[in-house]
Amino acid sequence: MARKLKGKIGSKGLKGALLRHKAKVKLVRNIESKQKHELRKKNSSANNKTVKRNQEFQKLNQGKVMPFEKDETLMLCGEGDFSFARSIVEQNYIESDNLIITSYDNSVNELKLKYPHTFEENYQYLKDLNIPIFFQIDVTKLVKSFKISKNNTWFKIINRLSDHRWGNKPLQNIVFNFPHNGKGIKDQERNIREHQDLIFNFFQNSLQLFNLINTKIQNDTLRYTQGYDLNEDTPQAKKLTAEGYGNIILSLFDGEPYDSWQIKLLAKKNGLTLSRSSKFQWENFPGYHHRRTNSEQDTTKPAKERDARFYIFSKYVSNSSKHNRKSKKDTDSDSD
């Protein structure tokens, strides 16, 4: 083992030089160690900030999950004071050119009386964007309510009200927020049965409307392309089945009596399956006020304090049907 040098750094000769060299090396090492520590600290802080930023971004994105895509088409049923419609447009969740709004009420004047402080401003905002707005639309009689006929086709009706901006787009999503018949039935069992009828008929009529609108588009496209389904992979065709069915979306409060409505069973009876569900996050829809069906008053408990969910239903397609459709597509491709 080397003998430890003793003496003063200022000493002359070899001994002093060695002591000075040793002190210099130690100083350099201390500086390097300090620099490495600072660098590690800085990197750690930067990493923590990055992680925190990513977590906040993920949280924000998770909170912004919508039951529909921005570039898809959407019809809102049973709108009250039109605040939900306005919110999704203002928040850029949907293109105004892809939106249709319907109300069960008879007219603008009726809604002004029902929602005197909120409706008119929302209505004017949406009207200025040339969004087609329909009144007297019963979700249990959709085709009849729209007065669709051979001479008065869906596309004539919708383009007349949208300044011809709808074109021949398919309908991909039908949304009914917090369905309620507005009857205020006290007998709970009867109340449940009537709402089950409402939901069942809504499912049934939505499927009829999808089929009526979208099948024509698909058939016209197939005739134009001589049987080749060139539209199958386009954004507006992705969520449609071969028969033209899109998504049916319900929002509903948690708990009773809503759980007893058994909407999944009602959907199944219409050949629908639950694709997914997600929490209805009120904060994602600023300006939206869930109202009573017959007045501007809030429900007994403020809606924003109540848990609710979105339910997205789609037409059930068996694996064999999917396989047959894929096989047909592959066969057509091979025959080229």
UniProtKB/Swiss-Prot annotation:
Family: Belongs to the class I-like SAM-binding methyltransferase superfamily. BMT5 family.
Role noted for this protein: S-adenosyl-L-methionine-dependent methyltransferase that specifically methylates the N(3) position of uridine 2634 (m3U2634) in 25S rRNA.
Subcellular location: Nucleus, Nucleolus
Protein name: 25S rRNA (uridine(2634)-N(3))-methyltransferase
Feature: compositional bias, Basic and acidic residues: 293-307
Native species: Saccharomyces cerevisiae (strain ATCC 204508 / S288c)
One MF term in the entry's GO annotations: rRNA (uridine-N3-)-methyltransferase activity
Misc: Present with 2960 molecules/cell in log phase SD medium.
One annotated Gene Ontology cellular component of this protein: cytoplasm
